[in-house]
Amino acid sequence: MMKTKKLMMVALVSSTLALSGCGAMSTAIKKRNLEVKTQMSETIWLEPASERTVFLQIKNTSDKDMSGLQGKIADAVKAKGYQVVTSPDKAYYWIQANVLKADKMDLRESQGWLNRGYEGAAVGAALGAGITGYNSNSAGATLGVGLAAGLVGMAADAMVEDVNYTMITDVQIAERTKATVTTDNVAALRQGTSGAKIQTSTETGNQHKYQTRVVSNANKVNLKFEEAKPVLEDQLAKSIANIL
């Protein structure tokens, strides 16, 4: 009888150790390759034109270094057959972009499996502790084995992290037109904590302007920003150039 209990205990402990790291192992396998996705909030339709000159104004107000981004966008635009010029007055198109944020983000709506992984480790600890019911003669020792099994799962989960970096960029495209374009600008300027000043202005020009937001995601297990940065920049450059 005692031998049977010991065999059952060994089998249960072995199963717990095997299962405790299953969440981490599953994550490591599924997310071993870098996945990059880019989405544009609005489609921009430009009129067909024979003019092929583009002026670029690329800004970065995030806390990450994006010093090479303008060069990548310029290369992508040139690859589409356009000429990048330094004078806005000589350009048929203007491309203005600002990187608002480039950081690790928790996309809870699509990555709920991360929380379930941690729950798996805790369940492993509780299951291991329950072995005491099979061996009342050494409850303390068996409890220690069960908790150790759970801690193995927690340690495995801690070593495997599903990381998603997101880059958010606002983009404005302007194209010249033969028509006269009248633009009314309205701005609400805050005055202290309880007031605001409404400022309006009207200008006349020869450009149609369009705005959109580009969101790029890089996802991989234990991903570092240094690895995510170049692919995020490449995806943004490709997305912007494909508007033309």
UniProtKB/Swiss-Prot annotation:
PROSITE patterns hit by this protein: PROKAR_LIPOPROTEIN (PS51257)
GO cellular component, one term: cell outer membrane
A Pfam family of this chain: TraT
Membrane topology, record value: Lipid-anchor
Covalent lipid adducts (S-diacylglycerol cysteine), residues: C22
Domain of life, per lineage: Bacteria
Lipid-modified residues, N-palmitoyl cysteine kind: C22
Keyword annotations from UniProtKB, A to Z: Cell outer membrane, Conjugation, Lipoprotein, Membrane, Palmitate, Plasmid, Signal
Job of this protein: Responsible for preventing unproductive conjugation between bacteria carrying like plasmids.
Family: Belongs to the TraT lipoprotein family.
Protein name (Swiss-Prot/TrEMBL): TraT complement resistance protein
Species this chain originates from: Escherichia coli (strain K12)
The gene coding this protein: traT
